[in-house]
């Protein structure tokens, strides 16, 4: 779709019991490529979650990749891929290969590593042509070649991208704009 995917207007975003971010107004368009910057605890993850919730888009249209996953979630992802029709599974395998992960070997793994789980979830999302990719510290648990392959895949991705990362080189390669989050404000 063209146009707006998410709109936040003068929102106050809580984390636990206190507002972390105040007076947040932000529009995510179909072609947005946004880097959220700021120190640890500033509210980058909170803003990502708020954008996901405000989008109103189905989980089929949004890829949300949180900073941390557990092994149980990764095993669920493997089962999901194995249960896909052949054509869809083939698209996931193509993306996995582009991310430097041999798909057949990964499918035989009983418990994927955190890096493999990130690649698997990203492959699932990109293979189903989501409209919005939201990534929280996507380079965690990835080696340098994997980071470079992920960067290339995201550069080629045609939809909206919002990511929170401390990896400025990765953000510069994949995003066209950035917002600084600090002291409860988004600038």
Predicted feature locations:
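ABC ATP-binding cassette signature C-motif
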Residues: 2-187
